[in-house]
Amino acid sequence: VKITVPEDFVVGATGALQNPDEVLTDEQINRLEKAKKSKEPVLIVTVDEALENLETKTSRQKTWHFKAENVRDYAFAASRRYIWDAMGVQVGDNTVMAMSYYPNEANPLWGQYSTKAVAHTVDFYSKYTFDYPYPVAISAHIDRMGMEYPMVSFNGYRPEEDGTYSERTKRGLIGVIIHEVGHFWFPMIVNSDERQWTWMDEGLNSFMDDLAGRAWDSELFHPRNNQDYIVRYMRGDKSNIMPIMTNSESIYQFGANAYGKPTVALNILRDTIMGRE
């Protein structure tokens, strides 16, 4: 896929960048190479470079070339406002590049946590399910909420205008990144049909992101995933209780069916019935 944008834009996309020598400076290429072996995020496009891009607003163009294999969808993020950082994650014999794209307004929150949360998710899911098969895993900043595509996730949350942020905002950012990056496995890699069986998308992923979140921070979990919530899901008027095998266009009890009930059931299976061992 080739994406032509103004020369001062930075682009992140599904797939591996094929022409860094045409779209990055020599220094940025060196930073990208350094990031592959770094245990901490390395700035590929710095704050100063992003602010300079924002000022220039050139009319010249350049083309970013990406290559992706075995994907069912595609996405990209492009902006002249983007700061770009990255770090390598060892998955089997491969190095996966965990990366984030965000504006300066998202700092210091994003610079401190976004790429680390991506790397944590890639490592954790690979150990508990199967190795992540793609070369990159991306978190791109948006205004709110989250959405996933192969190799690319869009995630909300940013600090206040003065740069401060609450513990809730920090955990919200980390939680949504873990969840959306987790969707790279379910449904993107396994290729389940989330429109028909939403629980096989959101439910399996919510179970996994609950484990990954607790591994990051013991307080990073959603209360509806606790085992005792099974009572809430089962009691009440039986005529109003919808089965989890309900298509996604039915929004009645959507949150419980797609997210909560499958996660609680899997937690009970893991912790109570089978045991973690």
Tell me the role of every PLM-derived stretch.
Residues 131-140, 193-196, 219-222, 277:
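Surface-exposed patches in mature extracellular/periplasmic domains of secreted proteins
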Residues 181-197, 211, 215-217:
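Catalytic Zn2+-binding segment of zinc metalloproteases
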Residues 103-113, 194-195, 252-255, 268:
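Second-shell loop/turn segments in exported
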Residues 93-97, 153, 178-185, 232-246, ...:
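Active-site-adjacent bridging/hinge elements
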Residues 2-178, 207:
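Hydrophobic helix-coil surface modules that form long, contiguous segments used
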Residues 202-264, 268-273:
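Acidic/His/Gly-enriched intrinsically disordered linker/tail segments
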Residues 2, 179, 269-277:
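Short, intrinsically disordered, charge-balanced linker/junction segments flanking boundaries
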